[in-house]
Amino acid sequence: MRKANYDKFPSTKLTGMLVQGWDIIISMLKEKMDARKVLAVDLYTGVYEEEVLDAFSKEFSGRVMNVRDLMKPEKEIQTLTERFMTEDVLFGYVTNLKLEDYLDADKVAAARKQISEAKDAIVIIGTGASVVAPQDAMVVYARSEERRVGKECFAVCRSRWSPYH
């Protein structure tokens, strides 16, 4: 009998750590922020945005910025993306748009000014938080794992800075 030449349970080993639960994540991130005054929490598909905003708003009262508030109006985004849509629900066209194309340049400029003038730490939350954040910001990618652990969320530190190197 022929033996299968594929791995039924593929995995990738990562360095660093995975942290579960927003209270623990926020506590750990506050320790790791050091002198950094900006924390960008970029959200992966499937993360409950309101849950994340609520958790961070409790700890960083009045200092949480929602990327959704920096987006262009819905009508403008529809106009921007309509050329990629078709009548077929399964097929469309691959877009050449970037995340920055969905953001309102004036709102982003105002947000960046507010960030640069801030005295206390600011948390930017949402898809594209790392795009809005300054280069020296601590960037965290948050993702949800509902299949295995209910509605628990995980954070993985990566990108421009990681507390694990």
Regions found by a protein language model. Name each.
Residues E50-V52, V132-Q135, R158-S159:
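Short glycine-/acidic-enriched loop or helix-start segments at secondary-structure transitions
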Residues G46-V47, A129-S130, F154:
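Short, solvent-exposed loop/turn segments at secondary-structure junctions
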Residues D34-K37, D120:
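A short, charged/proline- and glycine-enriched loop
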Residues G150-H165:
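Positively charged, low-complexity/disordered segments
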Residues R2-I24, G62-A121, R158, S162:
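ATP-dependent small-molecule kinase phosphotransfer cores
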Residues T15-L29, R36-S57:
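Glycine-rich P-loop/Walker A and Walker A-like loops and their local beta1-loop-alpha1 context
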Residues E59-F60, A109-K151:
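ATP-dependent NMP and nucleoside kinases share a basic, alpha-helical "lid"
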